[in-house]
């Protein structure tokens, strides 16, 4: 679709994405030659593509659908048999209809280059090429469902969201992910009072264009298998009950000061008042507020100005990870660290072993061993490195 007509130049369309700019060029993007060439490219893309738009979950937000409307022919000239392949299993999150695949290899390149996990690859060559996982096992890494957003057709779609709704039926609400401390920018799509799905929003300073699988699929907990009513065990079985019955049963089973409440420093006043009223009704006065130490100090701007940004992690030349399984606790920070390693950064980890997606030196968790090696690492980080970074366990929420 990037073909253009260039004058002066060869008498055939040129790929503008690979064409160097020179003085005096005349670029035509809507000439008859360009239209004919784009129609030919689109016709080749659609040769083996099934006419599944009415039943495809990608319908309404499909790149191939949009490009076909904009640049394609009104009718096909292909009368031969179309290619068909067997379905591939990629796990409980990714639904596959690989007959729709156009072999763009976006999913393969994402898994290898961004996630750093070689789980998705290509078999065979040419028209016979097929995209699949290793031995048709599930794609299990923490960013696997991003291939759903990358797929320009309906070959890879969301299995939990299959046949649930169409894009034009949904209300879009901009939001922030709270499943970890990264604060990824997301968009929540809802129909009525039900949240149907969560999708990433582009923010190059935070999550770029990715989200973790936990962020994407935690919305299921809002409507499925949710404890939205009181249950009491009667005769060995859980049965629905009212709140009054539940509170009376609690007060009877644990009267007086055998019941206590502990509230954190993030609880609002209304909730604290309700908790105090509940304990008073149960005959208890044991209520306490615990300070977690997670409050943010705003008295000194140095705590903000001297810290690295998420994007700044990519420019670090030495990184020390302290007590954090960063790949699972903050997958998008792990992506940034992987980029830094590609640029030559060294990574040191204080804590137990875990499977990284880049070379890292584990210093262990034994205090004796740390006393021997930690000083050397700190010297390397603070003296020899120009842009050191320290990532600690506070990335957990």
Q: Each PLM stretch: what is its role?
A:
Residues 3-177, 182-186, 192-194:
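Fe-S ferredoxin-like electron-transfer domains
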Residues 1, 12, 22, 36-37, ...:
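Generic alpha-helix structural propensity
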Residues 46, 50, 97, 104, ...:
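Catalytic alpha/large subunits of respiratory electron-transfer oxidoreductases
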Residues 1-2, 212:
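Short, thiol/selenol-centered motifs that function as redox-active sites or metal-ligating centers
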């Amino acid at each position: 679709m990037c073909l253009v007509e260039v004058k002066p130049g060869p008498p055939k369309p040129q790929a503008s994405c690979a064409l160097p700019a020179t003085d005096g060029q005349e670029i035509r993007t809507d000439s008859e030659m360009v239209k004919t060439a784009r129609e030919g490219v689109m016709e080749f893309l659609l040769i083996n593509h099934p006419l599944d738009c009415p039943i495809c979950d990608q319908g309404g937000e499909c790149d191939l659908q949009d490009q076909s409307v904009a640049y394609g022919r009104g009718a096909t000239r292909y009368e031969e048999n179309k290619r068909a392949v067997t379905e591939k299993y990629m796990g409980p999150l990714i639904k596959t209809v690989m007959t729709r695949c156009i072999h763009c290899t976006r999913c393969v390149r994402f898994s290898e280059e961004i996630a750093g996990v070689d789980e998705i690859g290509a078999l065979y060559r040419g028209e016979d090429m097929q995209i699949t996982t290793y031995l048709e096992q599930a794609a299990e890494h923490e960013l696997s469902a991003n291939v759903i957003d990358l797929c320009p057709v309906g070959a890879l779609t969301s299995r939990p969201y299959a046949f649930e709704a169409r894009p034009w039926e949904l209300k879009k609400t901009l939001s922030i992910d709270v499943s970890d401390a990264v604060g990824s920018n997301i968009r929540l799509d809802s129909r009525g009072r039900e949240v149907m799905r969560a999708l990433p929003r582009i923010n190059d300073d935070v999550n770029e264009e990715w989200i973790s699988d936990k962020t994407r699929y935690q919305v299921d907990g809002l409507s499925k298998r949710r404890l939205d009513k009181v249950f009491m065990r009667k005769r060995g079985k859980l049965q629905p009950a009212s709140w009054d019955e539940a509170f009376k049963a609690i007060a009877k089973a644990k009267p007086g000061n055998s019941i206590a409440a502990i509230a954190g420093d993030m609880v609002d006043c209304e909730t604290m008042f309700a908790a105090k009223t509940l304990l008073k009704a149960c005959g208890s006065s044991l209520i306490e507020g615990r300070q977690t130490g997670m409050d943010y100090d705003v008295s000194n701007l140095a705590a903000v100005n001297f810290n690295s940004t998420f994007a700044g992690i990519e420019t670090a030349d030495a990184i020390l990870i302290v007590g954090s399984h960063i790949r699972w606790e903050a997958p998008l920070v792990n992506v940034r660290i992987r980029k830094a390693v590609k640029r030559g950064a060294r990574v040191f980890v204080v804590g137990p072993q875990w499977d990284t997606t880049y070379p890292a030196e584990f210093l262990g968790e034994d205090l004796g061993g740390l006393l021997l090696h930690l000083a050397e690492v700190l010297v390397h980080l603070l003296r020899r490195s120009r842009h050191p970074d320290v990532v600690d366990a506070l990335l957990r929420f």
